[in-house]
């Protein structure tokens, strides 16, 4: 009992001795990990115990236990170890940009934080879209991005199955830059990280109900649907329906879905 109390007290002392910048960024790290592992393990449990549920690319997107363990190990290396290594850098960037950070003790103003969220959405849409497209360039793809495309029909844990460079530049950069640039209140930053991690797990889950359709088509067709936001793919004409060779390409599950007349396609 004494040792447990001492450990808890030490943890509180460490947190109390951090400045606001470090508290905010480490909070983002903890929230991101909690949401990622919750979503990944939950989706894997559904895959394992409810294998008959329809997936966007059919049942081939179910991982074996061995493949899941491998993907989870890579995810652990990225989101636990690599992400922790860059937390000080995130805090330092926040420190360099804003002399007066907002902490948990500061008042939360919803109108301001709504603008912060809007700004963060614009940042991640632009940042992820262009870093992702760059990763598809022939000079970079084989060395870095090909690893993420190992799974043409991914599941949630594959959301951060990536080369560390891609993970840190594209994934972490895209999610973290918005709250840092906009000097988000920590509650906003933590909520943004939670939504971002749950969203990326959903988009890799293979379940249409979790938002997998758009990004799953990217993994299947490769040269479309690069973005995660609502703007860049539309603006730069890289949606599946904007590209002639893909526009009328049937979805692999179409034969199991109702057609326009309500009958099976």
Q: Residue locations for each model-derived region?
A:
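Cytosolic/stromal cytosol-facing helical appendages immediately following the last transmembrane segment
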Residues: 1-26, 30, 39-64, 68, ...
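Hydrophobic alpha-helical membrane-embedded segments
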Residues: 31-48, 82-87, 120-131, 199
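Juxtamembrane helix-loop-helix connectors linking adjacent transmembrane helices
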Residues: 57, 84-124
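Interfacial transmembrane-helix boundary/kink motif in multi-pass membrane proteins
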Residues: 58-79, 104-116
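Membrane-embedded alpha-helical segments that form the functional core of polytopic membrane enzymes
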Residues: 109-129, 133, 189-202
């Amino acid at each position: 009992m004494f040792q447990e109390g001492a450990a808890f007290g030490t943890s509180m002392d460490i947190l109390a001795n951090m400045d606001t910048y470090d508290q905010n960024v480490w909070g983002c790290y903890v929230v991101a990990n909690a949401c990622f592992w919750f979503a990944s393990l939950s989706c894997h449990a559904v895959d394992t115990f409810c294998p008959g549920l329809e997936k966007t690319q059919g049942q081939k997107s179910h991982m074996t236990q061995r493949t899941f363990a491998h993907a989870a190990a890579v995810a652990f290396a990225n989101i636990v170890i690599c992400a922790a290594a860059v937390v000080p850098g995130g805090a330092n960037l926040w420190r360099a940009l804003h002399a007066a950070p907002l902490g948990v003790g500061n008042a939360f103003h919803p109108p301001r934080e709504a603008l912060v969220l809007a700004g963060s959405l614009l940042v991640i849409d632009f940042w992820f879209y262009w870093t992702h497209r760059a990763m598809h360039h022939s000079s970079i793809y084989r060395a870095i991005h090909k690893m993420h495309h190992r799974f043409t029909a991914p599941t949630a844990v594959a959301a951060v199955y990536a080369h560390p460079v891609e993970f840190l530049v594209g994934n972490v950069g895209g999610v973290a830059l918005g709250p840092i640039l906009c000097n988000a209140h920590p509650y906003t930053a933590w909520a943004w990280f939670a939504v971002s991690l749950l969203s990326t797990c959903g988009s890799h889950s293979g379940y249409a109900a979790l938002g997998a359709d758009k990004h799953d088509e990217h993994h299947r067709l490769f040269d479309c649907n690069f973005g995660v936001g609502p703007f860049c793919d539309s603006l730069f004409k890289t949606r599946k329906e904007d590209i002639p060779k893909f526009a009328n390409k049937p979805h692999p599950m179409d034969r199991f879905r109702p057609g326009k007349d309500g009958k099976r396609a």
